[in-house]
Curated annotation (Swiss-Prot):
One BP term from GO: glycogen biosynthetic process
The EC number(s) this enzyme carries: 2.4.1.21
InterPro entries (UniProt xref): Glyco_trans_1 (IPR001296), GS/SS (IPR011835), Starch_synth_cat_dom (IPR013534)
Family as reported in the entry's similarity comment: Belongs to the glycosyltransferase 1 family. Bacterial/plant glycogen synthase subfamily.
Protein name, UniProt field: Glycogen synthase
Keywords: Glycogen biosynthesis, Glycosyltransferase, Transferase
Annotated metabolic or biological route of this protein: Glycan biosynthesis; glycogen biosynthesis
Reaction catalysed by this enzyme: [(1->4)-alpha-D-glucosyl](n) + ADP-alpha-D-glucose = [(1->4)-alpha-D-glucosyl](n+1) + ADP + H(+)
Any GO molecular function: alpha-1,4-glucan glucosyltransferase (ADP-glucose donor) activity
Any one of the GO CC terms: cytosol
Annotated ADP-alpha-D-glucose binding sites: K15
Enzymatic class: transferase
Gene label: glgA
Function: Synthesizes alpha-1,4-glucan chains using ADP-glucose.
Length: 484
């Protein structure tokens, strides 16, 4: 099959979160399965700064935005043996950040990504590349399914192309004022309840959900959750309308990238069959961060955005207990100001068992996964989550809240799991979290049982292989909708 991935970020070119990891790793796995896979994203300043062997192409793209014909240049490079196309427009993409600044999102994001979506379709025709499936990701690409359904419905070039739309995080929907319709080149016929209208605003993700041939999201549990009023972010009714076309496919982990046996950032490599290096990495992490190098004290690691979504409202309440307990807590991340201040205050007070590391430090993250005994993810919601998969791979036993992809990957003996690999709790309360932390600390003291639990986690297979096979099935289903 010819499969085109359209995304606003792709590792290593541009990244703000897990979306970029998925849009790099899944294409690589599909390529290994024999498909003609290509990727397209905007040519941001971040991409330009990174180099990446990018070359100028001979094509250009055009799109009418806000009543004006806007032009963009075509550039290209590769991700391994996968062609990567980039659309350049300095007005829209030559900025310091992808989506906005600390003050908020760029006010013209609707125009920026409308230009990108229209540019993608224009470029495909000029290149004479007819994908069997266009796989779109999150609201920034949401106009593509809608345009193919409404504007390109009679266009023979796209008549046999299936469209899949993947929701990575339903909380970010592309909500804009009604007045932005014309700026995106859309007339008033799009502003209806069965299209983009959403409580008087424009909702781009809603349009994609109603227009795509198939919709996927990034875990089976999250797929069920978003169809409920509690977790549907106002779109549960729309998703219910498309229930038969909505599928949950668990994201995988790039096992080539995340492998303790080959990771050059570790103090000593190790594996499930030769796990001795795990202890060396724990000691190295403790020394690096100024913690007491004690093998019998459990290290709890957190690599996360510091936000309420990630459970930091619970952690904030429990910090005094962490400080008083016989454990070491290592935190790496950046995020909301109130949590940054809390952690910086703890750091300033010199709590000897807490290491706070503010910022984005990619060289430290693997050391935390390798040096931690327990990896903590108490998320309020988590569409899929990669941290728990990395932790399992690196022998850090995950402790998670039972939600989204965390519920699909971490299994607790207390819940009747016959092959437990971690600890989980359900009620989103400080009490439920601390009870589970206490359980994990007790379990850590039984060294024989702990070693078995750790090795069972390291033996789990959450690579992209099974997920890619499932996507193959869904691509074929999308093509069947086109009579192919």
């Amino acid at each position: 099959m010819k499969i085109l991935f359209v995304a606003s970020e792709v590792t290593p070119f541009a990244k703000t979160g897990g979306l970029a990891d998925v849009t790099a790793a899944l294409p690589k796995t599909l390529k290994k399965l024999g498909h003609d896979v290509r990727i397209i994203l905007p040519f941001y300043s971040e991409v330009e700064r990174g180099g990446h062997g990018i070359r100028k192409g001979r094509k250009s793209v055009e799109a009418v935005i806000d009543g004006v014909m806007k032009k963009g240049l075509f550039r290209h490079t590769s991700l391994g043996d996968i062609p990567v196309y980039l659309i350049e427009n300095k007005e829209y993409f030559s900025r310091d950040n992808l989506y906005g600044t600390a003050a908020g999102e760029y006010p013209d994001n609707h125009r920026r990504f409308a230009f990108f979506c229209r540019g993608v379709l224009d470029l495909l025709k000029k290149m004479d590349f007819r994908p069997d499936v266009i796989h779109c990701h999150d609201w920034q690409t949401a106009l593509i399914p809608l345009l193919l359904r409404r504007e390109k419905g009679e266009d023979l070039f796209f008549s046999k192309t299936g469209v899949m739309f993947t929701i990575h995080n339903l909380a970010y929907q592309g909500l804009f004022a009604k007045e932005t319709l014309a700026e995106m080149g859309l007339d008033s016929s799009y502003f209806t309840i069965d299209c983009l209208e959403y409580y008087g605003k424009v909702n781009l993700m809603k349009g994609a959900i109603l227009s795509a041939d198939l919709i996927t999201t990034v875990s089976e549990t999250y797929c069920r959750e978003i169809q409920t009023p509690e977790s549907g972010n106002g779109l549960d009714g729309v998703l219910g309308v498309r229930n038969a076309d909505l599928h949950g496919v668990l994201n995988g982990l790039d096992y080539d990238l995340w492998d303790p046996a080959t990771d050059r950032g570790l103090y000593k490599n190790y594996s499930v069959t030769a796990p001795a290096g795990k202890a060396v990495n724990k000691k190295g992490l403790q020394k690096l961060l100024g913690l007491e190098p004690a093998a019998d004290v459990p290290v709890i690691g957190i690599v996360s955005r510091l936000t309420a979504q990630k459970g930091f409202d619970l952690l904030a309440e429990l910090m005094p207990k962490f400080v008083r307990s016989r454990l070491q807590l290592v935190i790496l991340g950046t995020g909301d100001e109130k949590y940054l201040k809390l952690l910086q205050d703890i750091k300033a007070r010199g709590a000897g068992n807490i290491s706070v590391n503010i910022g984005f430090h990619p060289e430290l993250a693997p050391k935390i996964y390798a040096g931690s005994d327990i990896f903590l993810m108490p998320s309020h919601y988590e569409p899929c989550g990669l941290g728990q998969m990395i932790a399992l791979r690196y022998g850090a036993v995950p402790l998670v809240r039972k939600t989204g992809g965390l519920a699909d990957t971490v299994f607790d003996e207390q819940d009747g799991a016959t092959e437990p690999n971690g600890f989980s709790f359900e009620d989103y309360t400080p009490e439920a979290l601390w009870e589970t932390v206490s359980r994990s600390l007790q379990a850590f003291d039984d060294k024989g049982a702990w070693k078995k639990l750790m090795k069972r986690g390291m033996s789990c297979d959450y690579s992209w292989d099974a997920s890619a096979r499932r996507y193959e099935e869904l691509y074929r289903l999308a093509l069947a909708r086109k009579g192919r």
